[in-house]
Amino acid sequence: MKTKMPTLSEATRVVYKRRKNGTKSATNFLIGMKHNIKALGDLPVNKITRPMVNKMMDTLKQEHKNSNAVVNQKMGYLRVVLQEMEEDGYIEMIKMPKPRPTKNTKVHYLTKQMEDKLLNYLLDKEDTLHQELVRLIDQNPNTNYSLWNNRWETYAECYAIIACLIDLGCRVNELLNLEKRFVDFDNNQINFNDRKNDQAVAVPMTKRVRGFMYNYSCYKDDFDKLFTLNYSQLNTIWQKARKDLGYADKKFYTIHLCRHTCASRLVQRGVPILLVKDWLGHEDIENTMIYAHLAPKALHSVVEVLN
């Protein structure tokens, strides 16, 4: 072991510089560790014990009024710092306390019927606008109908984006910011390098996704985004569809529902939860565990006893 032992605040700065500086999670990490240090004290890292961490979690819960989910997240930040110190040869990693129990989160997702209903709605809108455009051009070929053409293309692109979100399970902005160079047709995968947890992941393409990727990558340069819609434009169409399809009173019916749909289907079809975690790009398995109850045959063996 090394002799000069860093304090927890010094170790936090080391991790920030090495792993967090410039990342999307940097601010949350620093705030979380500030609360941890206040609860634990700015001790040398080799003086931190499991009972101390348990007490820290109690303090975060009682004095900071943090939910169990937030307490678990802050414990995760502490774990990262201590693991870094272990790699640097300062300490032997302590056994961390078990995460605090969190409420079971109700998972909403699109059924196949709901998916078809949504995509058919977008397809019908696209088709109606296209037919109207053709009719107007037939009436007067010399008139500029770029506005109609843009509206038609917008619904066509929205259809492609929603279908890809359902199959890929990525976050909306990960897809909207996707550049052509990150679509690997040779290996049939998309390389997401701008994920929320700053960890790159390669996600295989379904046949449907591959078709859309091919269509929208044609005539694009390597650094061009595949899609032209921004989040606001996409959400405007989604909210109109939500209202027209009769889901206006369903708060869960947001674009993020596509991600839940992909995750739910993977679990329902027997994909191991750790693979689902990697597919979604979750940093913590706890985030993926909200889908675990959807696994097939979880209770099927019990019914055999009743039979």
Task: Label each residue range with its predicted role.
Residues 109, 194-198, 280, 284-305:
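Catalytic-site neighborhood detector that most strongly recognizes the C-terminal catalytic loop/helix
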Residues 72, 91, 97-172, 176, ...:
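Basic, Lys/Arg- and aromatic-enriched nucleic-acid-binding interface segment
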Residues 79-82, 86, 295-299:
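C-terminal flanking helix
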